[in-house]
Regions:
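N-terminal secretory signal peptides and thylakoid transit peptides that target proteins
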Residues: 1-18
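C-terminal segment of N-terminal export signals and the immediately downstream linker at the start
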Residues: 25-59
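Targeting-peptide/extracellular-domain and disordered-appendage signature
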Residues: 44, 70-92, 284-294
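A short, Trp-centered hydrophobic/proline-enriched beta-strand micro-motif
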Residues: 61-71
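Predominantly extracellular/secreted and cell-surface proteins with exposed
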Residues: 75, 79-215
């Protein structure tokens, strides 16, 4: 397998939109020297293929992995493209091996918004399209459940480097009706495109000493205007672009992000289920904000 493996069929969690205080409760530590012969992966075999997915994105064992992520939100209209805001946070993925080659994982996302290229949380910023002061809401999403089963996920390989990306299309009713939320709502229906993926090494995937391989997360989302931008139904979209790293310990995470998470939700890192009720940014906005009429 030198380039792409056949048939495209993927399943990734919705959440793009994390670490315990001791190394023993971090992600299964991936940075160990191999002591056993490598076990070659037959990517044409559905069982091998999905095991590689689980090992790169998460873990083969019943355990939790965490990603620190950071990126930038851009705005694009028919007339212009502008940098709008930065974002950063921690993604928790609680994995379970279901047997028969299948895996379940549950995502929890906790983070906040920043100036671009910064890890410092901001309370407000000036929207470059409108000139209006916007007040972001913090990022809290999940739990989102995903099951992956044996099939042909699409991989690309270059030497020891290997990666896959997944296109996920979402279409659902907007919790913010345009009648009640004229500036926060983009319409009755939300259409989103997530193009997320993971990069790693074949040598790590074939290392029998590892249950969890080192991984870099790629974040690429095309969304309607986020509610707090107060763009209403003006033509245009947001493009979220970022990277994340499967962490081995707290030293892999920005100190500002660790301080925020420990303050915002103590125990988030060590818990496999830091909260029970499912939430997302639109529900959170509707719960904690009031409509802005103009």
């Amino acid at each position: 397998m030198n380039k792409k493996i056949d048939r495209r069929s993927v399943l990734l969690g919705a959440g793009v939109a994390t670490v315990a205080t001791a190394a023993t409760v971090m992600s299964p530590r991936p940075y160990q020297a191999a002591e056993k012969p490598r076990q070659p992966i037959n990517f044409a075999d559905d069982m091998d293929n999905v095991r590689a997915y689980a090992k790169l994105a998460g873990t083969l064992s019943d355990d939790t992995v965490h990603y620190w992520y950071r990126g930038t939100i851009y705005g694009a209209t028919p007339d212009d493209t502008k940098t709008m805001l930065g974002f950063t946070g921690l993604l928790k993925m609680s994995w379970k091996n279901l047997g028969n080659g299948s895996f379940h994982y549950r995502n929890y996302d906790l983070g906040y918004f920043t100036e671009p290229d910064s890890d410092v949380r901001i309370e407000e910023f000036t929207n470059p399209f409108t000139g209006i002061t916007n007040r972001p809401i913090d990022i809290k999403g999940g739990p989102f459940d995903v099951v992956i089963t044996p099939r042909q996920y699409e991989w690309t390989r270059s030497g020891d480097d290997i990666w896959f990306s997944e296109a996920k299309h979402f279409k659902f009713a907007n919790k913010l009706s345009p009648e009640e939320w004229p500036t926060a709502s983009t319409g009755d229906t939300l259409n989103m495109l997530y193009l997320d993926g993971f990069n790693g090494k074949v040598s790590d995937l074939e290392n029998p000493e590892l249950d969890s391989a080192p991984s870099i997360l790629g974040i690429h989302h095309v969304n309607p205007w986020y509610p707090f931008f107060l763009m209403g139904q003006q033509p245009g979209v947001n493009y979220w672009h970022g990277k994340g790293k499967k962490i081995a310990d707290e030293s892999d995470v920005s100190p500002e992000v660790m301080a925020y998470v420990n303050s915002k939700m103590p125990g988030f890192m060590s818990s496999s289920a830091p909260w029970v009720n499912r939430t997302d940014s639109y529900l959170d906005y509707k719960t904690h904000r009031k409509p802005v009429l103009e």
